[in-house]
């Protein structure tokens, strides 16, 4: 059996930012034998924090065993090439101790804040995840999607973990759960991420 801790820091008016406390909690979780800590990404809100890669890097530098994971990287809000670079770099810094949780997002306020259209989230997510996987596993590639286009390029570094860190997909709706199951069945059960 494995034990994980999900951190959803909340900052109420007048409270200091929780970064020191987050690091203390992660270090304590490692001392207690927890296997993984999950960091939450939220924007324009008093809960979760926006800069998960920075928090993850700090956590990796202050621990030696516990896995550091995301719950989740909201892919429509990020450039997928940057996500691939950031998490491959963190995978090297942690010597394979990262998992990458991804999601499409569901909070209208966050989409409005980034000037994005919520009903485009699924397609933006799908394109971004495809780009990230290809960036991690192909020597070079180009992309011509609805939302992302770029000429042939090589994305570096490639991950420390081969072929890439474990990828976890968040799902709230029945539709998303069925879609994830369908992807796994289409892959004849060989998908390990």
Protein language model annotation of sequence segments:
Residues 9-10, 42-45, 72-81, 104-108:
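Acidic, glycine-rich active-site loops and adjacent beta-strand->loop/helix elements
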Residues 79-186:
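Internal, glycine-rich beta/alpha segment that forms the wall or movable "lid"
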Residues 14-21, 47-51, 78, 82, ...:
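Alpha-helix N-cap and loop-to-helix initiation/capping positions
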Residues 50, 74, 171:
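Conserved residues at beta->alpha junctions
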Residues 1-68, 163-165:
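N-terminal beta1-alpha1-beta2 module of alpha/beta enzyme domains
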Residues 3-7, 37-39, 68-71, 98-102, ...:
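Hydrophobic faces of well-ordered beta-strands that scaffold small-molecule active sites
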Residues 25-26, 37-39, 77-81, 96:
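Conserved N-terminal glycine/acidic-rich loop preference
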